[in-house]
C-alpha cells in the first residue's frame, strides 16, 4: 500500500484528494501538511502536521496542490528529505521551476499544470495541429472561476508551448497576452493567450486555428475538480515506482 501525503489539504483540490483517496485501491492517505490547522475533520489515523519533516517522514509520496510559495517550501524540504512528488501547483516562477528541476535529480517528480486525461490529449492534438496547419493564426482562450489567482492559467501556457513547439517557435518571443489600442496588424507568428475570470467555472480552454475561409477550434471543459484529484492519484500510483527524474502527465498516461 502506497502511503500518500497531501500538501495543500485546505485547498479546493486538496479536500477532494482526501475524499478520493478513501475510495482508492493500493494507495491511501497517511498524512496532511497544514500551516496552522485543518479546516475540517479527518480520520484520526491520519497525521495532521505543521512540521514539514514529520509530514514527509509519514508518507511514501506527496501530492501537492498549494500555492507557489508553499510549493517552494515543499521542494526545499524534499531536497533534504527526498520523496516522490506529484506537483499540480500552477503559477510557479522561474526560480521555483529551477528548484523543481534541481530536486528531480534526487527524486522522481511529476509536474503537470493539469492532471486530466483530456488536457493531456489536447496538448498532443494542439502540437499536431500547429505543425500541420501552417499559416493558420493561433489564439488561446482560457476561462476560470473568479477566485483563481494566476493568469493566464498554467494549462493555457502549456497549450501555448505545445502550439509553439509544433512550429519550432520560442513561445517567449511570439506570445501575446492582450491587445489594446491601435496595435496594427497581427503578426503571423503570434500565439495569443487570453484569460477570462468569472463565476464558478472549473476550467475551459479553447485553442483556435484560424485561416481565411475556415477555422478549427479544439477545446476542453472541466466540469468537476475531481478530474484533477483523480488524475493526481493515478499519477502518484505510477510515480511511486519510478527512478529520480522529471516526468510529465503525458509520461504517466503514455500519450
UniProtKB/Swiss-Prot annotation:
Subcellular localization, as worded in the UniProt entry: Cytoplasm
Residues given in the record as NAD(+) binding sites: 8-13, 88-90, 112-115
Pfam families attached to this UniProt entry: DapB_C (PF05173), DapB_N (PF01113)
EC number: 1.17.1.8
GO MF terms, alphabetically ordered: 4-hydroxy-tetrahydrodipicolinate reductase; NAD binding; NADP binding; oxidoreductase activity, acting on CH or CH2 groups, NAD or NADP as acceptor
Catalyses which reaction(s): (S)-2,3,4,5-tetrahydrodipicolinate + NAD(+) + H2O = (2S,4S)-4-hydroxy-2,3,4,5-tetrahydrodipicolinate + NADH + H(+); (S)-2,3,4,5-tetrahydrodipicolinate + NADP(+) + H2O = (2S,4S)-4-hydroxy-2,3,4,5-tetrahydrodipicolinate + NADPH + H(+)
Gene Ontology process terms (BP): diaminopimelate biosynthetic process; lysine biosynthetic process via diaminopimelate
HAMAP family tied to this protein: DapB
PANTHER family: 4-HYDROXY-TETRAHYDRODIPICOLINATE REDUCTASE 1, CHLOROPLASTIC-RELATED, DIHYDRODIPICOLINATE REDUCTASE
Described function: Catalyzes the conversion of 4-hydroxy-tetrahydrodipicolinate (HTPA) to tetrahydrodipicolinate.
Protein name: 4-hydroxy-tetrahydrodipicolinate reductase
Organism (species): Sulfurimonas denitrificans (strain ATCC 33889 / DSM 1251) (Thiomicrospira denitrificans (strain ATCC 33889 / DSM 1251))
Amino acid at each position: 500500500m502506497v502511503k500518500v501525503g497531501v500538501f495543500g489539504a485546505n485547498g479546493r483540490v486538496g479536500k477532494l484528494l482526501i475524499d478520493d483517496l478513501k475510495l482508492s485501491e493500493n494507495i491511501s492517505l497517511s498524512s496532511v501538511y497544514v500551516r496552522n490547522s485543518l479546516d475540517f475533520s479527518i480520520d484520526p489515523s491520519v497525521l495532521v502536521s505543521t512540521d514539514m519533516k514529520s509530514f514527509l517522514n509519514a508518507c511514501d509520496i506527496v501530492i501537492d496542490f498549494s500555492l507557489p510559495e508553499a510549493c517552494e517550501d515543499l521542494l526545499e524540504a524534499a531536497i533534504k528529505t527526498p520523496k516522490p512528488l506529484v506537483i499540480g501547483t500552477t503559477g510557479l516562477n522561474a526560480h521555483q521551476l529551477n528548484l523543481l528541476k534541481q530536486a528531480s535529480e534526487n527524486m522522481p517528480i511529476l509536474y503537470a499544470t493539469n492532471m486530466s486525461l483530456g488536457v493531456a490529449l489536447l496538448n498532443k492534438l494542439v502540437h499536431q495541429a500547429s505543425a500541420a496547419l501552417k499559416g493558420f493564426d493561433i489564439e488561446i482562450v482560457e476561462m476560470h472561476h473568479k477566485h483563481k489567482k494566476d493568469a493566464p492559467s498554467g494549462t493555457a501556457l502549456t497549450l501555448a508551448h505545445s502550439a509553439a513547439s509544433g512550429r519550432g517557435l520560442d513561445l517567449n518571443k511570439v506570445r501575446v497576452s492582450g491587445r489594446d489600442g491601435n496595435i496594427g496588424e497581427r503578426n503571423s507568428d503570434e500565439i495569443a493567450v487570453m484569460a477570462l475570470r468569472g463565476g464558478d467555472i472549473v476550467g475551459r480552454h479553447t485553442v483556435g486555428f484560424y485561416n481565411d475561409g475556415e477555422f478549427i477550434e479544439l477545446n476542453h471543459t472541466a466540469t468537476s475538480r475531481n478530474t484533477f484529484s483523480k488524475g493526481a492519484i493515478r499519477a502518484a500510483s505510477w510515480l511511486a515506482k519510478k527512478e529520480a527524474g522529471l516526468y510529465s502527465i503525458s509520461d504517466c498516461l503514455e500519450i
